Amino acid sequence: MNMAVHGLTGVIKSGDEANSFYHDAHNLEGCCDYVMANPPFNVDKVKAESTANAGRLPFGCPKENKHKEIGNANYLWISYFYAYLNENGRAGFVMASSATDSQGSDKDIREKLVRTGHVDVMISVGNNFFYTKSLPCSLWFFDKGKKEELRNKVLFIDAKNYYTKVDRTLNEWSEWQLKNLNAIVWLYRGEKDKYEALLREYKEALGRDNTFADQVHELSEKTKILRNEAKNAVELADKKDKKKTQAKYDKQLSEISENLAIAKEANWLYEKFGEGEYRDILGLCKVAYTNDEFKTGDEDSISIEEKGWSLTPGAYVGVAPVEECQKFIKNC
């Protein structure tokens, strides 16, 4: 139905043939330029023999239990998405946060995956990004066509504390927050022109030439003044005009609030990366080497190997300074 609504065509499988664990129904191994997926997390009771026979396991099959079942299918999905890529293919998918650091055969598979040099970016996502689940998750990105200078590196981004609160049970990334996360990746890849274009986009959206920090201050002060003005105006208005008066001020406050949100995101980005030079930011992003042999002499140099092949961003980026945490809470 979803494909029909969007005018798309495709081959839809059903029944046992549609079970990805036991069938490569579309014969995709090695064929895909891009893979995007949001698979079910932590699927259990997957038949080990049927799974092994279905292939697409370049790093081997997760260990089976005494019932000859795979107790957690997360690394089946991860293996499939990698296996589907062609020689320059790229993949991006959502995965349970536990998969970045799971042990046993999962760790062995993860080591083999990291050693390929094709893990590109790992991002931690906070709670409440799903409508039906409150648990955190991770975003995994593979790139078989990485630049040679990035081949033995992985960018880690911890975005658990970077979000917009929609309501009590739902968080999201705003349009500008998504652009900021993209900007970190652009700078890591040396795509400074894209970063500069985003700064121009911010300036055009705000329509001002003064610094982003100044704009945050000015708009914050303007908001305080207008709120007090609105409160007094509503109190002084005739009873029949109170709702109309409040609505007028609400509209003005909404417009200022929108600009303030944009200014805050612009300032958040510019404070960290200025005119466009990637750097590791404590508590936010860190570039790690895949193996010890590729580490530089820099005392801050770190490898995934020395972290026990963990792909958890928090293990690399560290903890943000207290003032940064307080600033984030204030902005929220």
Question: Which sequence ranges carry the predicted segments?
Answer:
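A conserved structural/catalytic subdomain of Rossmann-like adenosyl-cofactor enzymes
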Residues: 29-332
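S-adenosyl-L-methionine
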Residues: 1-30
